[in-house]
Design a protein with these regions (language model features):
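Cytochrome P450
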Residues: 1-164
Length: 164
């Protein structure tokens, strides 16, 4: 379960993070110049292009949320990717900013459903981007990225790059 659950989402973190850096060269240069921003950069990658976009939960008891009645047993869809771009929560939410603080995104869910692999995924992301940017001074996208069609997961199907 851990291997299957963590593989695709971590792969998506790396691909989504790379395309975010390629589309925001100033942020790539900032991270390259200051590798200590690695943790913040990965948090912003997770917030900005969440690997998991949608999740379903079943209400255990009757409740009201934001004026909407929910019956016990009713399935509720949580739009994690949308929550991570909530303008009431994040200043300028559609801007990719690796210096952003206080992200507290929902990319790994929350509460009893919080992802067990979150610390490992964060570490893998930090190591990948630190090594990638240190080793290759030039990284360029050769083609337009193709996103995998999915309602629940956001990840690239293809992204061809040249590294030098």
């Amino acid at each position: 379960l851990l291997f299957a659950a963590g593989f695709e989402t971590t792969t998506n973190l790396i691909g989504n993070g790379l395309i975010s850096l390629l589309r925001n060269r100033d942020q790539m240069q900032m991270l390259r110049s200051d590798p200590t921003l690695g943790h913040r950069a990965v948090e912003e990658m997770l917030r900005y292009e969440s690997s998991v976009q949608l999740d379903a939960r079943t209400a255990l008891e009757e409740t009201d949320i934001a004026g909407h009645h929910i019956d016990a047993g009713q399935v509720v869809l949580t739009l994690l990717g949308a929550a991570n771009r909530d303008p009431d929560r994040y200043q300028d939410p559609d801007r990719f900013d690796i210096t952003r603080t206080g992200t507290q995104h929902l990319s790994f869910a929350a509460g009893i459903h919080y992802c067990l692999g979150a610390p490992l995924a964060r570490l893998e992301g930090e190591v990948v981007f630190e090594r990638l940017l240190a080793r290759f001074p030039t990284i360029d996208a050769d083609t337009t990225p193709v996103w995998r069609p999915s309602l629940t997961l956001r990840g690239l199907e293809t992204l061809q790059v040249t590294v030098r």
